[in-house]
Amino acid sequence: MGSRLHVQQIKNGPPLPYKDDIRAFTRDYAASLDAQDPLSHFREEFIIPSVKDLKRKTLDPSEGEYSSMYLDARCIYLCGNSLGLQPRNTKKYINYYLRTWAIKGVTGHFTHHDDELLPPFVDVDSAGAKLMAPVVGALESEVAVMGSLTTNLHLLMASFYRPTTERYKIIIEGKAFPSDHYAVESQIKHHNLQPKDAMVLIEPQDPEHPILETDRILRVIDEHASTTALLLLSAIQYYTGQYFNIEKITAHAQSKGIVVGWDCAHAAGNVDLKLHDWNVDFAAWCNYKYLNSGPGGMAGIFVHEKHGEVKAGQGDGELELFRPRLSGWWGGDKATRFLMDNHFVPQSGAAGYQLSNPSVLDMNAVVASLELFNRTSMAEIRQKSLNLTGYLEHLLLASLDGVSDKPFSIITPPNPSERGAQLSLRLAPGLLDSVLETLEEYAVVIDERKPDVIRVAPAPLYNTYEEVWQFCQIFSEACRKALEKKD
């Protein structure tokens, strides 16, 4: 998309004080925005790698071959959409857990301590759900911290994808994250159906403009409504950074009798979700991106309360009624869990979808981060994110003014309400490797998607306006060098 058109389409966002201010292009101005930032204190709650750390060849903290002040400076980490940084209190939480395990052994499952950070092992999942609920806009009973993202998608589809001879299709976006694609494809095959018949891919009208307009999504839903069992979309598209209109799409699909699920991997902790109010049937997400719970950390699920009810049997010997699912003992009613009578009665809500005893080690890492989110609100985090990513966009677009041989374009929607923290930059052909080399030289951490896209995601809890300004200076230099090499 051309920079002029992109600027014209920027709308519906917060006031941008820097839009018409020439001072916005100075480092001092960026620093002044940081000075006014009500969330700035959260930055010190995270461990931000130094330039020296990134260049280390060992993990030995005594390694001292790098000594310049520059190398001791913090890197510019704009990759929270891939892996969030470690909160400082993660170590404290995990050490408390290790201490409990060491001195209590199995009795740690039920023993309370006066100075505990979390309840006994047997109840840690409840602590995680309590802190997670406000982050995704859910009732506490509607969320569970469990498993991993793709595993959870399979578990949820086992419950919510109930194909019939009339309704058997699953609609997903054409460029869904590969693991989602694999999961949907394998679920279809599991039911002895063929993906070519039962898998509907929503593709953009123009491959050069990979945004899926809401109207296009609704048209595809209408086209396949009578034969579709499930709609499963990403809340935020991992490649473009597009934030879909969850409320509108969900209501439209449900009005056609379609069950609706959302992969919120790039949305949880990023945008102000309202999964309960939007009447979403189910959702799943990982917690290691914007929610900073560590590589492969424990994930989360949402099951709307209307699907989580457990009804008592109507008479003697009648079994309880609940939504079919793949069951495990940790999802069972806590009052009867340890009776070992082989009669499964699930907990109500999302907790009833749990299978095994959760990893208390992983749960501590999740809670350590969620505790920070619960010190503020997703509305406040989202407000800063809109401002921070808006500033990034403003500086990037300004760098293209008057440039005939444009080194990049922004493929993320210009409307701030249609994106999260991430901007996806499509580089001109042949520039990617050189640009990445320069960014690495200056200790800028972003990620790439071959063949020509880099994703830049300022995380509002630990990134600053000054870092955004620095990135834009370095990125402009990287593009200049890449163009010179190309010539």
Swiss-Prot record:
Location within or outside the cell: Cytoplasm
Record's subunit section: Homodimer.
HAMAP family the record matches: Kynureninase
Species for this entry: Emericella nidulans (strain FGSC A4 / ATCC 38163 / CBS 112.46 / NRRL 194 / M139)
This protein's record includes keyword Signal: no
Protein name per UniProt: Kynureninase 1
Major subcellular site: cytoplasm
Single biological process term from Gene Ontology: L-tryptophan catabolic process to kynurenine
Residues binding pyridoxal 5'-phosphate: 149-150, 177-180, 234, 263, 266, 288, 329, 357
Lineage, opening ranks: Eukaryota, Fungi, Dikarya, Ascomycota, Pezizomycotina
Root EC class: hydrolase
Cross-referenced Gene3D superfamilies: Aspartate Aminotransferase, domain 1, Type I PLP-dependent aspartate aminotransferase-like (Major domain)
NCBIfam families: kynureninase
Cofactors required: pyridoxal 5'-phosphate
Assigned GO CC terms: cytoplasm
Recorded family membership: Belongs to the kynureninase family.
EC number of this enzyme: 3.7.1.3
Entry's Gene Ontology molecular function annotations: kynureninase activity; pyridoxal phosphate binding
Function: Catalyzes the cleavage of L-kynurenine (L-Kyn) and L-3-hydroxykynurenine (L-3OHKyn) into anthranilic acid (AA) and 3-hydroxyanthranilic acid (3-OHAA), respectively.
Reaction catalyzed: L-kynurenine + H2O = anthranilate + L-alanine + H(+); 3-hydroxy-L-kynurenine + H2O = 3-hydroxyanthranilate + L-alanine + H(+)
List of residues that carry N6-(pyridoxal phosphate)lysine: 289
Keywords: Cytoplasm, Hydrolase, Pyridine nucleotide biosynthesis, Pyridoxal phosphate
Pathway participation: Amino-acid degradation; L-kynurenine degradation; L-alanine and anthranilate from L-kynurenine: step 1/1; Cofactor biosynthesis; NAD(+) biosynthesis; quinolinate from L-kynurenine: step 2/3
